[in-house]
Amino acid sequence: MRKLEQFINLLSEIIECTEAESARIYSGHPSQWEINQLDGIVRPEVNELLSFALKGKVFFKYGKRQRMLESTYLITDSFSALDKTPLGRKVLDLQKLYNSL
């Protein structure tokens, strides 16, 4: 599978995980994520990357030299173990792939 296809698939999986995590929060279940993190950072960033990827392009918001995603920064800077959640693991996988593009 080409890297762009992997990128698109992973972005789609992250959107699904984000929707599932939002549903958990809205139904009253505990979550390490906060709704403002999902709605304000992760979802908009992933949707923006996906919109470019579906056109065959990789979007580097801050240039090719600065590739850390805002979602990754959120995970690594958090006091919660967001990197241990399914969504967090997928975002970190995305970061690894993004670095290789």
PLM-predicted stretches and their roles:
Residues P44-K61, L82-P86:
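Amphipathic alpha-helical coiled-coil segments
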